[in-house]
């Protein structure tokens, strides 16, 4: 749909299906009211009816009665996707700061809008500014923010086919847009000609010379035609440049899709086609954009400076976050209304009463910038929450895949065990049958014998058997008592033998000590004996020496005696004899001394011999004693060892006898108990086997059911892909029809221009004929068409515009819901069977460039992004702001307004609208099919059960969906009723600490004064929460510095900490 010309300023609108998007509004050229002839109005109305009829025939589906806005959601979503990739591709140029790429869709940047004006060549006699055609300004509808999944390698071929089809559609739309712009330009030129002709007739009547009056229109018409031809050529050149640029962007897109790091880019395939359509819109969408590229560049440089690098023909410098022009093209082509002159009512920033004095452009720009910043923050918040949700679902999917693998391995093991147990069960059953048959045979034989025997004999036998039993019992008791007495005697004898053994051991120890003492004394005596033998040998040597000396002395004595005899014979000698006598005296004295010493030595020798004899006798005695003692000790040791061995043998024999008797006593009882235990064990095994067989059959049925659902989903997705291809083909056909219509309109308008030029020449000739009349007649004749013609045209246009305005602002909610449902019918397979689910507005969109639909977890039927968008759309309604800023451009605004007014009574309902929209738990989806099937089947959890590995599995089964979404819903439910708490993710919602304090306040109100807290004191809030949790034994796994200095802490660590709180208080 098209509205009147509006100032170029980014205005954020609250959409009903996604986050808020920014859009550029066309600029307001300075001008005044221009009139339209009744013929042009009739022609335009007929032309719009034809377009509307053709578009409704090709695009309307049965049951949809909404306007063209709701019928063309697919092209709008494809354009929105194409924008995001182009903004990613151009994020490195430096004009706008980019965000950190994480492989998931990044939040959208602030849109940069450019106001444009064009200088129109005027004739010398034109003194008024020209008005712009309102049909050239387009008002795009809000599109959905898509959460696209990364494209898989299987679907690259399908994505390429989609991209080709969409590029064809956009090229056709661009061509139709160029034709439409040419039609609008020709209309404006026609209006200019009429105005100039009216002014020239007035000037000609005022000043009588007719030559100047007739020459001016002719001189003005020729340069106009030339300028039109030149502009047409320039537009064709620009169109060729844009086509080349579009081809280059397509090559970039295919390169990005084929690159290995295309996970982030594949989720936004098709974005590269956005600049072409945006550039077409900026070049051809309105007469403001019809100027030459050089004039546009100069004006942009002077207006915006070096911050905005713009170009008239380059698509790389167009605004990044503007909405997709494809949806607006379809709208203003299929639901075009006749253009009307500019009026004060077309200002979107007027008050609700429609006063002619609207708000100033500065206030409008400030309002738009404030709303843009707010919406961009919300978009970033939603983007991070979706990224967090995607990562959590991916982790849980990988865990579930591992669990499936483990369960399949365990299932195989169970199957093997089942086969083994079945074989053993069959063997036991056969054995039991054989035993039962034998038992029956024996019973039959016993019954036959009983029948054959007489009753008296039977009674005697019974008495004999009873007597035998009593005798056996008495014997067994007597033997038992005997055995007990024997056991007591043996124990007593064993104790005595042990005491004797202990005494013998002590005696042996004492004898060993005495033996050691005697050995020491013997060694000492031996040492003394060796010393005495040495001294004896020395004495013997000295005795031999003395004997030799004695012999020599005897020989000397004999010699001296002979000399004395000779001397005595010679008595009469002289003094010599005297000397000999003295010498004899000396010799005699020495002889006496030697004799004394010899006698002493003989006495000592005798003493030494006596001592030697005495010591040898003692030594012999000691040796005899030692040998005797040794023999006695050895004999005693042998006796003690023999006695100990005998005692040990007796004790072992007695123990063996006791054990044998005990074993014989309790043997039968053990056998009976073993038999009973084996029987019970076999019965338990049989029951367990039957239970495992039932479990395996139920698991098999569950797996078959899952396989059927998956095959059904695949079939429905393929059918939906075929439907989408058919829709694209119909869109191509419609675009071709529109192109043909635009070409026909162009030819008709050119024909009308020639007719008007001929009529203008004819009127100029008539003007020369009636120049002789008076001035008041000519003035009245010229004023009548000027003053009377605008009234019906303005009234008609205003009436039509009001009709279009009402049609835009108040669509039927059921129609919009059914249209959205028809577009995304195959994406809610998990919810199709539920009659109690009423999710009509919050539908999950799908990407037209991805082969599989965008699916969320079954429990998270309303994602945090959609909740945020719903809250952002409900908030203005509850505060009572002006509805003129939101309603004219939103096809589902009335529906959201009604939902917001219904929920206004509950102030805390806006925290979790998904809980209200779901009336019962969702049906089976892809993530929780195995868990729900296991719980409905009534099976006991196995050793790989989710509850054992993670207590959050029970919470996920209670709330449905993934563990992350279940824990998030639990947090929302626990903190419901607390002020300033809005939990939508596990990152930014917990950064100020209020959410943690509120969650812990529900369990520990004495530890946390929640009424005194505010969101500005982050450190206090976090310290209070950590201390309260630590007081009950929950260790703080979060870092205080990370929580304080980052607005978005790590969501996994926050989720782990919240899970610890849940496990402590809830499990």
From Swiss-Prot:
Phosphoserine: residues bearing it: 38, 55, 76, 111, 133, 136-137, 360, 365, 368, 424, 847, 863, 912, 914
Keywords, comma-separated and alphabetical: Coiled coil, Lipoprotein, Membrane, Myristate, Nucleus, Phosphoprotein
Compositionally biased region (Basic and acidic residues): 153-163, 896-909
Annotated region (Disordered), positions in chain: 1-163, 192-223, 250-375, 831-922
Residue ranges that the Swiss-Prot or TrEMBL entry lists as coiled coil: 574-773
GO BP, sorted A to Z: associative learning; blastocyst development
InterPro entries: CH_dom, CH_dom_sf, F-actin_Monoox_Mical
Residues with Phosphothreonine modification: 77, 141, 357
Record field: compositional bias (Low complexity): 28-40, 123-143, 350-363, 912-922
Subcellular location: Nucleus
Domain Calponin-homology (CH) span(s) in chain numbering: 961-1066
Keyword rRNA processing attached: no
Gene Ontology annotations for the cellular component aspect, listed alphabetically: apical part of cell; cytoplasm; cytosol; fibrillar center; membrane; nucleoplasm; nucleus
Stored Pfam families: CH
Biased composition (Polar residues): 90-101, 256-285, 336-349, 866-884
Family note: Belongs to the cytospin-A family.
Protein name, entry field: Cytospin-B
Designated gene of the protein: Specc1
């Amino acid at each position: 749909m098209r509205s009147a010309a509006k100032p170029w300023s980014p205005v954020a609108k609250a959409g009903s299906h996604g986050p808020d998007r920014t859009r550029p509004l066309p600029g307001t050229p300075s001008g005044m009211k221009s009139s339209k002839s009744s013929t042009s109005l009739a022609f335009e109305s007929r032309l719009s009816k034809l377009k509307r009829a053709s578009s409704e025939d090709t695009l309307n589906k049965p049951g949809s009665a909404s306007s063209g806005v709701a019928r063309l959601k697919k092209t709008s979503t494809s354009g929105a996707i194409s924008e995001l990739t182009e903004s990613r591709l151009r994020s490195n140029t430096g004009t706008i700061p980019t965000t950190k790429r994480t492989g998931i869709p990044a939040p959208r940047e602030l849109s940069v809008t450019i106001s444009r004006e064009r200088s129109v060549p005027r004739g010398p006699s034109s003194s008024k500014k020209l008005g712009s055609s309102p049909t050239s300004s387009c008002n795009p509808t809000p599109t959905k923010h898509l959460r696209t999944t990364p494209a898989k390698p299987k679907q690259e071929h399908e994505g390429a086919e989609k991209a080709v089809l969409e590029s064809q559609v956009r090229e056709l739309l661009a061509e139709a847009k160029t034709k439409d712009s040419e039609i609008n330009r020709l209309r404006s030129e026609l209006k200019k000609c009429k105005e100039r002709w009216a002014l020239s007739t007035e000037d000609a009547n005022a000043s009588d010379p007719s030559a100047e009056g007739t020459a001016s229109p002719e001189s003005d018409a020729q340069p106009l035609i030339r300028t039109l031809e030149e502009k047409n050529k320039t537009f064709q050149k620009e169109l060729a440049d844009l086509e080349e640029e579009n081809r280059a962007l397509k090559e970039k897109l295919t390169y990005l899709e084929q690159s290995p790091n295309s996970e982030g880019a594949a989720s936004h395939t098709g974005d590269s086609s956005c600049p072409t359509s945006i550039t077409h819109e900026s070049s051809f969408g309105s007469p403001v954009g019809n100027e030459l590229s050089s004039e546009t560049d100069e004006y942009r440089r002077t207006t915006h400076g070096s911050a905005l690098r713009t170009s008239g023909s380059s698509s790389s410098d167009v605004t990044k976050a503007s909405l997709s022009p494809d949806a607006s093209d379809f709208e203003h082509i299929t639901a075009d209304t006749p253009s009307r002159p500019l009026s004060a009512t077309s200002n979107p920033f007027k008050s609700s009463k429609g006063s002619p004095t609207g708000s100033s452009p500065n206030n409008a720009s400030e309002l738009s910038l404030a709303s843009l910043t707010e919406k961009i923050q919300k978009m970033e918040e939603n983007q991070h929450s979706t990224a967090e949700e995607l990562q959590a679902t991916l982790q849980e999917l990988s865990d579930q895949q591992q669990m499936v693998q483990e369960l399949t391995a365990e299932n195989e093991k169970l199957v093997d065990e089942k086969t083994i147990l079945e074989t053993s069960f069959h063997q036991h059953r056969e054995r039991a049958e054989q035993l039962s048959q034998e038992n029956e045979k024996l019973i039959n034989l016993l019954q036959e014998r009983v029948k054959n025997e007489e009753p008296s004999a039977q009674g005697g036998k019974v008495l004999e058997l009873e007597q035998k039993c009593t005798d056996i019992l008495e014997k067994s008791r007597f033997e038992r008592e005997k055995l007990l007495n024997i056991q007591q005697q043996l124990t007593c004898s064993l104790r005595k033998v042990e005491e004797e053994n202990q005494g013998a051991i002590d005696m042996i120890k004492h004898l060993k000590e005495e033996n050691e003492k005697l050995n020491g004394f013997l060694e000492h005596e031996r040492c003394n004996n060796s010393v005495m033998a040495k001294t004896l040998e020395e004495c013997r040597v000295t005795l031999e020496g003395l004997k030799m000396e004695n012999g020599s002395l005897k020989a000397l004595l004999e010699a001296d005696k002979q000399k004395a005899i000779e001397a005595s014979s010679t008595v009469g000698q002289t003094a010599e004899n005297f000397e000999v006598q003295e010498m004899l005296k000396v010799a005699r004295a020495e002889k006496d001394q030697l004799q004394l010493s010899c006698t002493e030595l003989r006495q000592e020798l005798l003493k030494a011999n006596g001592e030697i004899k005495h010591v040898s006798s003692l030594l012999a005695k000691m040796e005899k004693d030692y040998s005797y003692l040794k023999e006695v000790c050895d004999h005693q040791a042998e006796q003690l060892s023999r006695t100990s061995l005998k005692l040990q043998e007796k004790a072992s024999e007695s123990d063996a006898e006791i054990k044998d008797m005990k074993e014989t006593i309790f043997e039968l009882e053990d056998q009976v108990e073993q038999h009973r235990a084996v029987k019970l064990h076999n019965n338990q095994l049989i029951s367990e086997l039957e239970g495992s067989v039932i479990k395996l059959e139920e698991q098999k049925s569950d797996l078959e059911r899952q396989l059927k659902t998956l095959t059904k989903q695949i079939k429905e997705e393929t059918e939906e892909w075929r439907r989408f291809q058919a829709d694209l083909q119909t869109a191509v056909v419609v675009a071709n029809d529109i192109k043909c219509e635009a070409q026909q309109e162009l030819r008709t308008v050119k024909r009308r221009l020639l007719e008007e030029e001929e009529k203008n020449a004819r009127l100029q000739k008539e003007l020369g004929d009636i120049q002789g009349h008076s001035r008041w007649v000519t003035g009245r004749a010229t004023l009548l068409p000027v003053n009377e013609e605008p009234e019906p045209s303005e009234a008609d246009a205003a009436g039509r515009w009001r009709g279009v305005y009402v049609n835009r602002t108040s669509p039927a909610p059921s129609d919009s819901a059914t249209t959205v449902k028809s577009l995304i019918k195959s994406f809610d397979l998990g919810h199709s069977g539920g009659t109690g689910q009423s999710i009509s507005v919050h539908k999950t969109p799908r990407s037209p460039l991805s082969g599989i639909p965008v699916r969320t977890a079954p429990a998270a039927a309303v994602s945090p992004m959609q909740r945020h968008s719903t809250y952002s759309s409900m908030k203005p309604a509850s505060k009572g702001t002006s509805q003129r800023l939101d309603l004219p451009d939103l096809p589902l605004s009335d529906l959201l307004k009604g939902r917001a007014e219904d929920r206004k009574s509950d102030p805390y309902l806006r925290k979790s609208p998904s809980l209200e929209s779901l009336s019962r738990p969702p049906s089976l989806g892809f993530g929780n099919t195995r868990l729900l099937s296991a719980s409905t089947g009534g099976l006991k959890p196995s050793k790989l059960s989710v509850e054992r590995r993670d207590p959050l599995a029970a919470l996920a089964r209670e709330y449905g969906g993934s563990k992350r979404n279940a824990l998030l819903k639990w947090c929302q439910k626990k903190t419901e009723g607390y002020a300033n708490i809005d939990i939508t993710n596990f990152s930014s919602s917990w950064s100020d600490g209020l959410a943690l304090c509120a969650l812990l306040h529900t369990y520990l109100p004495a530890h946390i004064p929640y009424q005194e807290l505010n969101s500005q004191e982050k450190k206090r809030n976090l310290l209070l929460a950590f201390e309260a949790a630590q007081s009950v034994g929950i260790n703080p796994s979060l870092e205080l510095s990370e929580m304080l200095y980052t607005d978005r802490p790590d969501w996994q660590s926050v989720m782990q900490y919240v899970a610890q709180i849940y496990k402590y208080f809830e499990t």
